[in-house]
Amino acid sequence: VHLSVLSILFPSASVAPSAPASPCVRVCRIEADGLCRGCLRTGDEIACWSRLDEGERRRLMETVLADRTRERYRFLDRLHEREQVSGVLYPLRHPPAGDGWNRSELDDLLPHQEALAEAAVLVGLVPRDTGTQVLLTRRTDALRHHGGQVSFPGGRVERDDAGVLGAALRESQEEIALGAAQVAPLGYLDPFLTVSGFRVTPVVAVIDPDYVPQPHPGEVAEVFEVPFEFLMSATHLHQVEMEFRGRRRSVLEYDWPGQRIWGATAAILYNLRRRLEEVA
Protein backbone atom coordinates (compact mmCIF):
# COMPACT_ATOMS: atom_id res chain seq x y z
CA VAL A 1 0.00 0.00 0.00
CA HIS A 2 1.43 3.40 -0.97
CA LEU A 3 0.98 5.90 1.85
CA SER A 4 1.71 9.61 2.04
CA VAL A 5 4.51 9.34 4.60
CA LEU A 6 6.71 7.65 1.98
CA SER A 7 6.24 10.43 -0.58
CA ILE A 8 7.08 13.41 1.60
CA LEU A 9 9.38 16.00 0.04
CA PHE A 10 11.71 17.33 2.69
CA PRO A 11 12.83 20.98 2.64
CA SER A 12 16.38 21.84 1.65
CA ALA A 13 18.85 21.67 4.52
CA SER A 14 21.24 24.10 2.85
CA VAL A 15 21.60 27.43 4.62
CA ALA A 16 23.33 30.48 3.22
CA PRO A 17 26.50 31.22 5.19
CA SER A 18 25.97 33.84 7.87
CA ALA A 19 27.82 37.14 7.78
CA PRO A 20 29.92 37.72 9.68
CA ALA A 21 31.22 34.14 9.87
CA SER A 22 31.12 32.59 13.32
CA PRO A 23 31.78 29.08 14.59
CA CYS A 24 29.45 29.57 17.56
CA VAL A 25 26.85 26.80 17.95
CA ARG A 26 25.42 28.29 21.18
CA VAL A 27 26.89 25.61 23.42
CA CYS A 28 29.09 28.07 25.26
CA ARG A 29 31.16 26.72 28.13
CA ILE A 30 34.92 26.93 28.66
CA GLU A 31 36.26 23.46 29.45
CA ALA A 32 39.31 22.53 31.54
CA ASP A 33 41.57 22.79 28.49
CA GLY A 34 40.62 26.45 28.05
CA LEU A 35 38.52 25.86 24.93
CA CYS A 36 34.81 26.44 24.44
CA ARG A 37 32.92 23.16 24.32
CA GLY A 38 30.88 24.24 21.32
CA CYS A 39 33.25 26.18 19.04
CA LEU A 40 36.73 25.25 20.38
CA ARG A 41 37.80 28.90 20.64
CA THR A 42 39.73 30.23 23.63
CA GLY A 43 38.19 32.92 25.81
CA ASP A 44 40.54 35.49 24.27
CA GLU A 45 39.57 34.45 20.75
CA ILE A 46 35.90 34.79 21.59
CA ALA A 47 36.48 38.22 23.17
CA CYS A 48 38.32 39.62 20.14
CA TRP A 49 36.12 37.97 17.49
CA SER A 50 34.09 41.10 16.77
CA ARG A 51 37.30 43.01 16.00
CA LEU A 52 38.41 40.59 13.29
CA ASP A 53 37.46 41.16 9.68
CA GLU A 54 35.64 38.53 7.64
CA GLY A 55 38.80 37.13 6.09
CA GLU A 56 40.55 36.77 9.45
CA ARG A 57 37.56 34.96 10.91
CA ARG A 58 37.34 32.50 8.06
CA ARG A 59 41.07 31.82 8.13
CA LEU A 60 40.89 31.10 11.86
CA MET A 61 37.94 28.76 11.34
CA GLU A 62 39.53 26.91 8.41
CA THR A 63 42.97 26.47 10.00
CA VAL A 64 43.25 26.80 13.79
CA LEU A 65 39.74 25.64 14.68
CA ALA A 66 39.79 22.88 12.08
CA ASP A 67 43.06 21.59 13.55
CA ARG A 68 41.59 21.67 17.05
CA THR A 69 38.55 19.74 15.86
CA ARG A 70 40.75 17.01 14.40
CA GLU A 71 42.84 16.92 17.57
CA ARG A 72 39.91 16.71 19.98
CA TYR A 73 37.79 14.36 17.90
CA ARG A 74 40.39 12.06 16.37
CA PHE A 75 37.72 9.44 15.74
CA LEU A 76 35.94 11.75 13.25
CA ASP A 77 38.11 10.66 10.34
CA ARG A 78 37.17 7.04 10.99
CA LEU A 79 33.60 7.69 9.84
CA HIS A 80 33.71 6.86 6.13
CA GLU A 81 30.29 8.47 5.56
CA ARG A 82 31.21 11.72 7.30
CA GLU A 83 31.30 13.98 4.22
CA GLN A 84 28.19 12.40 2.73
CA VAL A 85 26.15 12.66 5.94
CA SER A 86 27.34 16.16 6.86
CA GLY A 87 26.34 17.39 3.43
CA VAL A 88 22.63 16.64 3.94
CA LEU A 89 22.27 18.11 7.44
CA TYR A 90 21.30 21.55 8.68
CA PRO A 91 24.52 23.17 9.98
CA LEU A 92 25.02 23.38 13.74
CA ARG A 93 24.83 27.19 13.64
CA HIS A 94 21.36 27.06 12.08
CA PRO A 95 18.90 24.68 13.77
CA PRO A 96 15.91 23.99 11.49
CA ALA A 97 12.89 26.21 12.02
CA GLY A 98 9.25 25.53 11.25
CA ASP A 99 6.92 22.65 11.90
CA GLY A 100 7.68 18.95 11.87
CA TRP A 101 7.78 17.22 8.49
CA ASN A 102 5.06 14.80 9.62
CA ARG A 103 2.54 17.43 10.77
CA SER A 104 -0.12 16.38 8.28
CA GLU A 105 -0.05 12.83 9.66
CA LEU A 106 -0.90 14.06 13.17
CA ASP A 107 -3.34 16.91 12.60
CA ASP A 108 -6.15 15.17 14.46
CA LEU A 109 -3.91 14.09 17.36
CA LEU A 110 -2.01 17.22 18.37
CA PRO A 111 -3.41 20.04 20.52
CA HIS A 112 -4.14 23.05 18.32
CA GLN A 113 -4.29 25.60 21.14
CA GLU A 114 -1.12 24.56 22.96
CA ALA A 115 2.48 24.99 21.88
CA LEU A 116 4.39 21.78 21.39
CA ALA A 117 7.20 21.08 23.85
CA GLU A 118 10.70 21.27 22.35
CA ALA A 119 12.85 18.14 22.57
CA ALA A 120 16.06 16.83 21.04
CA VAL A 121 17.61 13.42 20.41
CA LEU A 122 21.14 12.32 19.53
CA VAL A 123 21.48 10.18 16.40
CA GLY A 124 24.88 8.70 17.21
CA LEU A 125 27.01 7.15 14.46
CA VAL A 126 29.80 4.89 15.75
CA PRO A 127 32.68 4.16 13.33
CA ARG A 128 33.69 0.51 13.76
CA ASP A 129 36.21 -1.55 11.83
CA THR A 130 33.28 -3.69 10.69
CA GLY A 131 31.29 -0.68 9.49
CA THR A 132 29.40 2.28 10.92
CA GLN A 133 26.86 1.51 13.64
CA VAL A 134 23.91 3.53 14.97
CA LEU A 135 23.64 3.75 18.76
CA LEU A 136 20.15 3.12 20.15
CA THR A 137 18.65 2.65 23.59
CA ARG A 138 15.66 0.83 25.00
CA ARG A 139 13.82 2.91 27.57
CA THR A 140 12.77 1.46 30.90
CA ASP A 141 9.16 0.34 31.14
CA ALA A 142 8.39 2.77 33.97
CA LEU A 143 9.02 5.98 32.00
CA ARG A 144 5.99 8.22 31.44
CA HIS A 145 6.61 8.83 27.74
CA HIS A 146 7.29 5.89 25.40
CA GLY A 147 8.30 3.50 28.17
CA GLY A 148 9.90 0.27 26.97
CA GLN A 149 10.40 1.59 23.44
CA VAL A 150 13.59 1.78 21.40
CA SER A 151 14.77 5.36 21.05
CA PHE A 152 17.72 7.67 20.66
CA PRO A 153 19.18 9.30 23.77
CA GLY A 154 17.41 12.60 24.32
CA GLY A 155 14.54 14.44 25.92
CA ARG A 156 12.89 17.77 26.60
CA VAL A 157 14.79 21.02 26.09
CA GLU A 158 15.17 22.60 29.54
CA ARG A 159 15.40 26.31 30.29
CA ASP A 160 19.14 26.15 31.04
CA ASP A 161 20.00 24.20 27.89
CA ALA A 162 21.88 25.84 25.03
CA GLY A 163 19.07 25.06 22.59
CA VAL A 164 18.40 21.68 21.05
CA LEU A 165 22.09 20.85 20.67
CA GLY A 166 22.74 21.50 24.34
CA ALA A 167 19.72 19.41 25.30
CA ALA A 168 20.80 16.45 23.16
CA LEU A 169 24.30 16.50 24.67
CA ARG A 170 23.03 16.89 28.23
CA GLU A 171 20.46 14.12 27.91
CA SER A 172 23.04 11.79 26.36
CA GLN A 173 25.36 12.41 29.28
CA GLU A 174 22.59 11.83 31.81
CA GLU A 175 21.11 8.75 30.15
CA ILE A 176 24.18 6.85 28.95
CA ALA A 177 27.19 8.80 30.38
CA LEU A 178 28.35 10.05 26.97
CA GLY A 179 31.10 12.59 27.69
CA ALA A 180 31.73 15.83 25.80
CA ALA A 181 35.02 14.59 24.33
CA GLN A 182 33.37 11.38 23.11
CA VAL A 183 30.80 12.94 20.79
CA ALA A 184 31.28 15.24 17.79
CA PRO A 185 28.02 16.81 16.51
CA LEU A 186 27.68 17.13 12.73
CA GLY A 187 24.32 18.85 12.20
CA TYR A 188 20.53 18.51 12.35
CA LEU A 189 17.80 16.56 10.62
CA ASP A 190 14.26 17.84 10.10
CA PRO A 191 12.10 18.27 13.22
CA PHE A 192 9.63 15.48 13.90
CA LEU A 193 6.38 15.72 15.86
CA THR A 194 5.27 13.02 18.29
CA VAL A 195 1.79 12.04 19.44
CA SER A 196 2.90 12.88 22.99
CA GLY A 197 3.15 16.56 22.01
CA PHE A 198 6.86 17.10 21.34
CA ARG A 199 8.67 18.79 18.47
CA VAL A 200 11.84 16.71 18.30
CA THR A 201 15.01 17.99 16.61
CA PRO A 202 17.46 15.16 15.81
CA VAL A 203 21.16 15.99 16.27
CA VAL A 204 23.40 13.72 14.17
CA ALA A 205 26.81 13.12 15.74
CA VAL A 206 29.85 10.85 15.60
CA ILE A 207 30.57 8.84 18.75
CA ASP A 208 34.03 7.68 19.80
CA PRO A 209 34.16 3.91 19.22
CA ASP A 210 36.10 3.57 22.50
CA TYR A 211 33.13 4.95 24.44
CA VAL A 212 31.59 2.45 26.88
CA PRO A 213 27.88 3.11 27.64
CA GLN A 214 26.78 3.39 31.25
CA PRO A 215 22.96 3.41 31.11
CA HIS A 216 21.06 5.29 33.80
CA PRO A 217 19.09 2.53 35.58
CA GLY A 218 15.99 4.70 35.97
CA GLU A 219 15.78 5.66 32.31
CA VAL A 220 17.64 3.22 30.06
CA ALA A 221 17.19 -0.54 30.15
CA GLU A 222 19.65 -1.32 27.36
CA VAL A 223 22.11 0.28 24.92
CA PHE A 224 22.78 -1.45 21.61
CA GLU A 225 24.00 -0.82 18.07
CA VAL A 226 22.55 -1.54 14.64
CA PRO A 227 24.53 -1.35 11.37
CA PHE A 228 24.06 1.97 9.59
CA GLU A 229 23.92 0.15 6.25
CA PHE A 230 20.98 -1.95 7.47
CA LEU A 231 19.02 1.10 8.66
CA MET A 232 19.69 3.03 5.44
CA SER A 233 18.35 0.21 3.26
CA ALA A 234 14.74 0.54 2.07
CA THR A 235 14.52 -3.26 2.11
CA HIS A 236 14.36 -3.41 5.90
CA LEU A 237 11.82 -0.62 6.52
CA HIS A 238 8.10 -1.32 6.33
CA GLN A 239 4.80 0.35 7.07
CA VAL A 240 2.49 -1.33 9.53
CA GLU A 241 -1.06 -0.41 10.43
CA MET A 242 -2.31 -0.08 13.98
CA GLU A 243 -5.44 1.12 15.74
CA PHE A 244 -4.88 4.40 17.59
CA ARG A 245 -7.49 6.80 18.96
CA GLY A 246 -10.33 5.52 16.91
CA ARG A 247 -8.86 4.89 13.48
CA ARG A 248 -6.29 2.88 11.58
CA ARG A 249 -2.92 4.59 11.30
CA SER A 250 0.33 3.74 9.57
CA VAL A 251 3.73 3.74 11.27
CA LEU A 252 7.22 2.82 10.12
CA GLU A 253 9.01 -0.22 11.51
CA TYR A 254 12.30 -2.02 10.83
CA ASP A 255 12.58 -5.80 10.66
CA TRP A 256 15.55 -5.87 13.04
CA PRO A 257 15.64 -9.11 15.08
CA GLY A 258 15.41 -8.87 18.84
CA GLN A 259 14.32 -5.22 19.12
CA ARG A 260 11.29 -3.37 17.80
CA ILE A 261 12.62 -0.24 16.07
CA TRP A 262 9.52 1.68 15.06
CA GLY A 263 7.55 4.92 15.38
CA ALA A 264 9.48 8.15 15.86
CA THR A 265 12.87 6.41 15.91
CA ALA A 266 12.22 4.67 12.60
CA ALA A 267 10.84 7.89 11.09
CA ILE A 268 13.95 9.88 12.05
CA LEU A 269 16.17 7.26 10.42
CA TYR A 270 13.91 7.33 7.37
CA ASN A 271 14.36 11.11 7.18
CA LEU A 272 18.14 10.63 7.12
CA ARG A 273 17.89 7.93 4.47
CA ARG A 274 15.71 10.05 2.21
CA ARG A 275 18.09 12.99 2.48
CA LEU A 276 21.02 10.78 1.52
CA GLU A 277 19.06 9.36 -1.41
CA GLU A 278 18.33 12.85 -2.72
CA VAL A 279 22.03 13.55 -3.25
CA ALA A 280 23.13 10.06 -4.28
Segments the model singles out, each with a brief description of its role:
Residues R41, S50-L60:
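Short cysteine/histidine-rich metal-coordination sites, predominantly Zn2+-binding motifs
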Residues A21, I46-A47, E71:
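Compact, charge-rich alpha-helical regulatory domains located at protein termini
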Residues V1-S12:
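A broadly conserved sequence feature marking short terminus-proximal activation segments
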Residues P23-D44:
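Local cysteine-cluster metal-coordination motifs and their immediate loop/turn environment
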Residues F10-V15, A21-R29:
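Short, intrinsically disordered, charge-biased short linear motifs at domain edges
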